[in-house]
Regions:
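Short, functionally important structural connectors and interaction interfaces within domains
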Residues: 5, 9-10, 16, 29, ...
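Phosphate-handling DNA/RNA-contact segment within nucleic-acid enzymes
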Residues: 53-177, 194
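TOPRIM metal-binding catalytic domain and adjacent DNA-binding surface shared by DnaG-type primases
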Residues: 1-78, 82-85, 174, 214-215, ...
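Short, solvent-exposed coil/turn linker segments
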Residues: 49, 80, 123, 228-230, ...
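Residue-level preference for alpha-helix termini and adjacent loops
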Residues: 30, 44-46, 76, 95, ...
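TOPRIM fold recognition
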Residues: 32, 130-133, 139-249
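Residue-level signal for pocket-adjacent positions within structured domains
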Residues: 40, 100, 110, 226-229
């Protein structure tokens, strides 16, 4: 069943992403693996290098943002954005040639969806089975999948923020005895999400992620680690041994 947008748009984008993920250039595959994503994970996620389809996108806003065929992101990493049940709801494009740039396109109804990067729908089955959930900021911080227990799930929120949809999803699907591990960056933004903060304009307390989750009955632990600003940086400094030392796993 196609939940979120028109059949022709979903078919066009699905075909384009499948083509982009097939026969990856060696340098692209090496880049993704070198950033720490396990091979199983990046293949399950359908990460590719965008190849412009021969036909134009049926979505007008996609054409305006990226060109009729996606010419403006040709060769960029293409990362499907899926709902927890595996339906395609958008795409993220990311440069990998040394320049930093990220561009996103979401279907209109994706606003109702908890937009985590992850191995959907496999991750949902693991959550149903009682696995813990580890949430990081960036997609390459998901390298911690190399060291957490196999039964657990690693997800990325694409930044230091948990939406209402994220919280509702976690509260609904996590098992009562499972734990949520907030593993945001070791910077001010990450710490504010962990501890909460006072809004400068309103002077009101803004709840951190642990407090928000605890209010809906979810056990939340803030992951403490050393040796880098974020898991991706720790990976680049020393691979799996550095991650294990930093996280004591």
């Amino acid at each position: 069943m196609l939940w979120f947008f028109g059949d022709c748009v979903q078919a066009w984008l699905t075909d384009a992403l499948l083509t982009s993920a097939s026969d990856l250039p060696e340098e692209v595959e090496g880049y993704v693996l070198g950033r720490g994503l396990p091979e199983r994970m990046f293949r399950n996620m359908g990460i590719g290098a965008w190849r412009c389809p021969s036909t134009e996108s049926p979505a007008e806003d996609f054409r305006k943002k990226f060109g009729p065929h996606g010419e403006l992101v040709q060769g960029w990493l293409s990362i499907p954005v899926r709902s927890p049940r595996g339906s395609l709801v958008g795409v993220e494009f990311r440069r990998w040639d040394g320049e930093k740039a990220v561009r996103k396109w979401h279907a209109p109804d994706a606003a109702w969806c908890p937009l985590f990067h992850g191995e959907w729908p496999l991750a949902l089955h693991k959550i149903w089975a009682g696995g813990d959930v580890w949430v990081v900021e960036g997609i390459f911080d998901m390298c911690i999948a190399r060291i957490v227990p196999e039964r657990d799930v690693v997800l990325s929120t694409g930044g230091a923020a948990m939406s209402r949809q994220h919280v509702d999803f976690v509260a609904r699907f996590m098992a009562p005895k499972a734990a949520f591990h907030l593993t945001y960056d070791n910077d001010e933004t990450g710490r504010r999400q962990a501890t909460g903060f006072t809004d400068e304009k309103t002077q009101r307390h803004v709840r951190g992620v642990p407090e928000r989750l605890q209010r809906v009955g979810v056990t939340c632990h803030v992951t403490r680690y050393a040796g880098g600003k974020d898991p991706g940086e720790i990976w680049e400094r020393g691979g799996v041994p550095a991650l294990r030392a930093a996280f004591r796993l």
